[in-house]
């Protein structure tokens, strides 16, 4: 009787958790290495798997949205992240947001309960031999990062991610805010803080002159647009925030029946509804400055901060030079990478890459050929993008319809067109799963 093969998975974030889950459920043994809690990163607070260190939102759910399509694909692939997200969802209008603590706890418990997963709480300092999935994320420890750099023979690439502050609901002045989702989509899920032009001017001036926290030695000023600090956005011009997180369109104040000059939105952060985060307010301001400046927002004058915003480094590889669409390295086929390190950007994007990498690592362990997911699925399109775009100008990429093949028929309405792309993707993923991915253990 042949022995059961084993795959190493390094890192138990979103990508590593998905990789371990899928490998184990394909009948392959997993050694899952996670250095927390013995060694923490600058952004993590717990030892839980799949800890959400930025927002608690997994973004839109609708099939007309690229993030909605990706989540639908993940559900078809039996994603542990999506299972936990749906069990621990909190109100968020048309989006899917979660109670971050119970979400991570369920994923940790589910993976820990698998009989063929061995969890090893120690830091890995060099790339191990054997079939391995590296999913150490944007905050990879320095020793392993050096090993990866030496393997790839390239310089590090890094940029900033920033996390928004979290507030207590009972400290918000509810007389000054109102409950509403933009354009009244879904349930009324956001607390909205309306601003007059005069209030906005005071806030804007305070924000652009606020003192930022000192960056760590390993950080520089690169900023990825998807998680831009609010103070950096403000410095790009007075109007910039009004087209971003302070956009008032579709958020008429029920007291006046009119659209405010600006609106700051608060989104529920926990299942109990006791905590809210300030939407789009990722920041690197000093904590005292956050208290001073954000208390200028109507309704937040006396707010209690349970966690101030923080900023941390993100690291990613030049995947077009290094990886194949199976997430294998070109020079060592038994070494896979997954997660934000590959250049997919975002929670669900990272988790989805873990599904693909984990599936292919398990296939390799079982003596099967790794497979490329169809490019007309979002998972396949992302894998294709990060391995086929220009290496010299490579930047992280969120899920979006622009990286997917166009429809054969022309549909003028954008929402209808995107929905049709999504329906095609889900149909093709079903066929691919049934005809290509089925493994008889």
From Swiss-Prot:
Residue runs in coiled coils: none
GO BP, one annotated term: tRNA wobble uridine modification
PANTHER family, alphabetized: GLUCOSE INHIBITED DIVISION PROTEIN A, METHYLENETETRAHYDROFOLATE--TRNA-(URACIL-5-)-METHYLTRANSFERASE TRMFO
Family named by the database record: Belongs to the MnmG family. TrmFO subfamily.
Key words of the record: Cytoplasm, FAD, Flavoprotein, Methyltransferase, NAD, NADP, Transferase, tRNA processing
GO CC entries: cytosol
SUPFAM superfamilies for this protein: FAD/NAD(P)-binding domain
Protein name per Swiss-Prot or TrEMBL: Methylenetetrahydrofolate--tRNA-(uracil-5-)-methyltransferase TrmFO
Catalytic activity: uridine(54) in tRNA + (6R)-5,10-methylene-5,6,7,8-tetrahydrofolate + NADH + H(+) = 5-methyluridine(54) in tRNA + (6S)-5,6,7,8-tetrahydrofolate + NAD(+); uridine(54) in tRNA + (6R)-5,10-methylene-5,6,7,8-tetrahydrofolate + NADPH + H(+) = 5-methyluridine(54) in tRNA + (6S)-5,6,7,8-tetrahydrofolate + NADP(+)
EC main group: transferase
MF-aspect GO terms: flavin adenine dinucleotide binding; tRNA (uracil(54)-C5)-methyltransferase activity, 5,10-methylenetetrahydrofolate-dependent
Pfam families noted in UniProt: GIDA (PF01134)
Primary role: Catalyzes the folate-dependent formation of 5-methyl-uridine at position 54 (M-5-U54) in all tRNAs.
Domain of life: Bacteria
EC number(s) from the headed UniProt entry: 2.1.1.74
